[in-house]
Regions:
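Short, conserved, surface-exposed binding loops centered on an aromatic residue
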Residues: 39, 61-65, 98-100
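N-terminal active-site segment of His-dependent metallophosphoesterases
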Residues: 1-61, 147, 151-155, 174, ...
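Short coil/turn linker and secondary-structure boundary residues
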Residues: 21-24, 74, 164-166
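Conserved acidic residues
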Residues: 45, 68, 123
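Metal-dependent catalytic neighborhoods of phosphoester/phosphodiester hydrolases
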Residues: 16, 50-67, 74, 79-93, ...
Length: 194
């Protein structure tokens, strides 16, 4: 099973309070996030963290996660590539990655995109960074019934009522119900990919 979550921000007090995470302080958030991951993500699953893994102690927080197969999609708080390579392995860190979610081409990036590879053909895009901020999500919704979604803890709280990563079945259920971009009909001559 593939699992996706962005922005855990371990040890990042300012983000935990700014984002209104429903925990009492950073230690409580850290424990809540680790419990949510380990309760749902099996040791042999694939776990994709879409950026902003931790403020400090990446090795410590990686050891707290039981899953053996973790891929980090770097975010704006994921500095120190050498340290991260030592924690995750050089072949497990990307700025952008493409995977299949129930057979659907899916672009993973920390940042939301208006257009992504094959977006006009129904591909998915998973991102973080904006922490499911309503004004930002509404701005993205102006682009139409897009097949992209925020997979942050704030988004999981809204979808499930509690914090947990999204699995590939969640992603497929949510995004397959959306119509998706119809950009070729909106652009002159069908656009560049027609």
């Amino acid at each position: 099973m593939k699992w996706f979550w962005s922005d855990p921000h371990f040890d990042h007090e300012a983000i935990a309070s700014k984002m209104g995470r429903k925990t009492e302080g950073i230690d409580s958030w850290n424990a809540c996030a680790i419990e949510a991951i380990n309760k749902h993500v099996d040791r042999h699953d694939q776990f994709f963290i879409l950026g902003d893994f931790t403020w400090k102690r990446p090795g410590y927080w990686r050891q707290q996660i039981n899953c053996k197969h973790i891929t980090l999609i770097r975010g704006n708080h994921d500095d120190g590539i050498t340290k991260l390579q030592n924690v995750f392995g050089a072949g497990n860190i990307y700025d952008l990655r493409v995977v299949k979610v129930r057979g659907v081409h899916t672009v993973l990036c920390h940042y939301p995109m208006a257009f992504w590879d094959r977006s006009h053909k129904g591909s998915y895009h998973l991102y973080g960074h904006i922490h499911y901020s309503a004004p930002r999500e509404k701005l993205l919704d102006l682009l139409g019934d897009r097949k992209s979604m925020d997979v942050s803890p704030e988004a999981s709280l809204d979808y499930f009522g509690y914090y947990r990563p999204f699995n590939e079945d969640d992603i497929y259920t949510i995004l397959s119900a959306r119509k998706g971009h119809d950009f070729p009909k909106m652009l002159p001559n069908g656009g560049p990919d027609a």
